Every structure is written in C-alpha cells, then in structure tokens.
C-alpha cells in the first residue's frame, strides 16, 4: 500500500513541480525539499524501525561477545532495507525528471546519494534513540538541532539550508565526488559517536542489551 502511494506521489510531484515552478527543473525543487524528507524519515523511524534492544535479543544466547554483536548491528543499520524505503518515491520521480538530462547514470548516482543520506539519518536516529533510553531529557537534542536548522532556513534571506540541499542533490546527480565524500564523512562521524555512546556509557549498554 505504502509503496503504491509513494510511487503515485513521486509521479505527481514531477508534473506538479514543473507546472508550479516553470523557471526551475523539478529535481531542483525536490532537492530543496530533501531536508524535510530527512526530518519526516527521522520521525517515522521511531514508529517503524525496531530498537537495537529488540534486534539483539535473538542473538543473546549465541556465543558472541555483546560488544561485537552491537558493532555488527550498528554497521548493518547502514545497509538496512528501511534506508531504501523512500526509493518508491524517488525512483519514479527521477525517471521522469532526471533521465532526460543526465541519463541512467545520473539516476544511479542520485539514488546512491539518497541512500547515503538515509544511512546518515539512520545513525543520527540511533544516537537520539540511545540517549533517550538513558534520559527523556535528551529529547531536547533533536528538538534543538531541528530548531537550529529551521532558524537557519527561515531567518536569513536566501533559505541557506534548502539551497545547500539543492546543490548537494545536484552534486549527486552529476557524480560530484565531493558531495559523496561529505556525506560519507558525516556517516563515519555519526557511527563513531554511536560506538562511543554504547561502549563508554554503561547505562546505555544495559538499555541496549537487556
């Protein structure tokens, strides 16, 4: 049901953006909205993505060190099938808007970039979820981050956040290596933060494996 719904939205957005913003390409508008897609994805993960404590329970009786098990599950979260969920929206949109300028190569590069953004979002979600398992007060972290992004977007002129996302998305389409390396660097940083939280914080470790 959700797949068909997202495919329909992806198709309709390609035509709607072309009609509403005739001076811009539809994929420019989509890229500007990627920040909102990431926020929506973050919120949906709390409802759809299982907590690590649930994922780890089936393996607790196996002769595997818990630390290594947690490390493995963290790495697997980067290639989780959930990170491809939004492809149902992006693929039909890209086929109708990107292919005529950049061909299938542009679409493949774009999809790789979107996947990296979703993997990055997954590790950001895990940081917030891990901290929330310790103290509910940590809900202020995502609220503060998204509040800062909103202030950066709407207070100055030029909408710098959506403009940055538009340029990043176009970098993906064009196969700009710096665009990919920037997101990969962010993923590695978030992964290291996750590992540090789990291995250093004893209460967090118990909340994950109990």
What are these regions (language model features)?
Residues 1-56, 66-205, 210:
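Hydrophobic alpha-helical transmembrane segments of membrane proteins
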């Amino acid at each position: 049901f959700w797949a068909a719904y997202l495919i329909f939205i992806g198709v309709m957005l390609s035509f709607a953006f072309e009609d509403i913003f005739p001076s811009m390409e539809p994929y420019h508008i989509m890229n500007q909205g990627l920040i909102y897609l990431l926020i929506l994805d973050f919120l949906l993960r709390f409802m759809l993505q299982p907590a690590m404590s649930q994922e780890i329970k089936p393996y607790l009786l196996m002769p595997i060190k818990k630390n290594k098990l947690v490390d493995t599950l963290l790495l697997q979260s980067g290639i989780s099938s959930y990170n491809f969920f939004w492809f149902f929206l992006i693929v039909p949109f890209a086929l109708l808007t990107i292919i005529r300028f950049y061909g299938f190569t542009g679409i493949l590069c774009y999809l790789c970039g979107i996947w990296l953004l979703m993997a990055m979002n997954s590790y950001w979600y895990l940081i917030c979820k891990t901290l929330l398992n310790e103290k509910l007060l940590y809900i202020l972290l995502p609220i503060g981050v998204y509040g800062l992004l909103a202030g950066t977007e709407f207070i100055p002129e030029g909408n710098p956040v959506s403009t940055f996302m538009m340029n990043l998305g176009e970098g993906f389409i064009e196969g700009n290596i710096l665009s990919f390396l920037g997101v990969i660097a962010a993923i590695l940083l978030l992964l290291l933060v996750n590992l540090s939280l789990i291995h250093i914080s004893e209460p967090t470790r118990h909340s994950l494996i109990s």
